[in-house]
Amino acid sequence: MAPSTIGTNVAGDKYEYDPENWMAKGTSTLNNGNGTKGTLDVDLPERHPETGINVLVVGAGMGGLMTTLECWRKGHNIVGILERNDGPVYSGDIIVIQPSAVSVLRHWPDMMRDMEDEQVNAAVSYEQHTGRHIYGPTVPSFNELEHLASRKGPFVAPAQIREKFYRMLLRQVAKLGFKVQYGKRAVSYFEDIAAGKGGVVLESGEIQVADVVVAADGLRSTSEILIAGEHTPTKSSGMSIYRTAYPREMAMKDETVRKRWADTKEIWEYWLGPGMYIGVFFSEDVVSWGFTPRDTHGGATESWEPDTDPEDVVKELLRVPDWDPAIAALVRTAPKGAIVHWPLLWRNLRREWTSSGGHVVQLGDSAHSFVPTSGNGATQALEDAITLATCLQLGGAARNAPLATKIYNLLRYERVSCAQKMSFVNSQLKTETDWDGIWADPIKVRTRFPKWIHNHDPEDYAYAKYGQAFAHLVAGADFANENFPPGHHFVPWSIEEVYADIEAGKKVEALLDGDWS
């Protein structure tokens, strides 16, 4: 990592997380896809009985790595982890991961300790763009006392440093004895139902097969062609985001920045302006900001290439008058070559995430994209991984794996759909702010982290609902999910419908039935 930038789109050392670097001397990697429990210096979870299900993971992002870990713990054979990049890519900066996604870490002592040591328990505050204070400092709603008492897993701070969280997953994968195969780009997926296999064709012409192929390779995964026949088209939100992270000491060289934040150790502030907002994060060693304006130029692309000049961001910022001078000063402290410009694009959610025979299954962004400002993309990808591994365990054998993937799909689709709709609620909250309502009751400005999301345990839910889902798919028995807002009558929706409501001046939050709090 370059000293002046954090989380840039450059492949790291592909050998850093080779198993031999993380295992005690004299231990070796097994070749049958079961990893190893021969390490002396790690604390591994108890592994469930082997199922004999061979799983090939395509994509070594957070969803793919959690799939690897949980599939190993649930007794499945990991026959490969394929990644298109030439090494681990530490793109990204500060992320929100909600408790539902990491309750499973109670089974992974090393990762639980790592997360608790490395996360940032920043206070959260809300400001008007002029500098007028709105609300805070406070905690995210998922850390209110009423929710902490019964929580399984680690304490979850408001902010995770993406690179640190991702390295935690890479370390744990290496400790199991698995090696990510880099430079392996999937160009097409297939399945042979008669043979009971799914497969992937790589750019090199190599073919790999398994009982279950997990497409965790992100946006525009070629698994879409097998499953849906086409890539899901995008629709612009009319917004984009500029994001960056760099050492705190660089920001503190500016006098105006020092005056505002020098005495602040750990804070996450949201500054709300007309049609735009900026999130500002400070830890003891990192500063990060994400500025979300109207995308007036349409020049942003879905790429983590840090190719934006800070002065261009300042120009966008100052399209709205009366910003507190500290914000423009902070933006100018970003080093050149450290700012990513990303469009906020929506994709309608498809109901089907598996191939017809169930041997190829999608998770994370390949199944359901979330815009980077949603605070939910990583959470739902990790929930996917936990759910899929548990469903395969309950399937119990390779011959039952295709039905297990379809049960996973059934358990996840409606919940993810509702989570995506919450992204619109939070977007309107920050860009179409009801100031009369906020000044009358400032707590209403808080980012929405609903109980039905953060109090969920995807592993327990899969255990509880698998049998009912099985009966529904096999025999047509009634089935109802319970992992979305209580009292909500689920109806599939489209981005076009939501935008029609927004353009009619309606608040998405006001149109929601049931308890979305």
UniProtKB/Swiss-Prot annotation:
**Keywords (A to Z) from UniProt:** FAD, Flavoprotein, Monooxygenase, Oxidoreductase
Identify the catalytic residues.
243, 270
Q: What Pfam families does its record include? A: FAD_binding_3 (PF01494)
**Residues that coordinate or bind FAD:** 96, 162, 365, 378
- GO MF annotation list: FAD binding; monooxygenase activity
Superkingdom of source: Eukaryota
- PANTHER family, sorted: FAD-DEPENDENT MONOOXYGENASE MDPD, MONOOXYGENASE
What family classification does the UniProt entry report for this protein?
Belongs to the paxM FAD-dependent monooxygenase family.
| Protein name according to UniProt | FAD-dependent monooxygenase dmxR9
Question: Which source organism?
Answer: Cryptosporiopsis sp. (strain 8999)
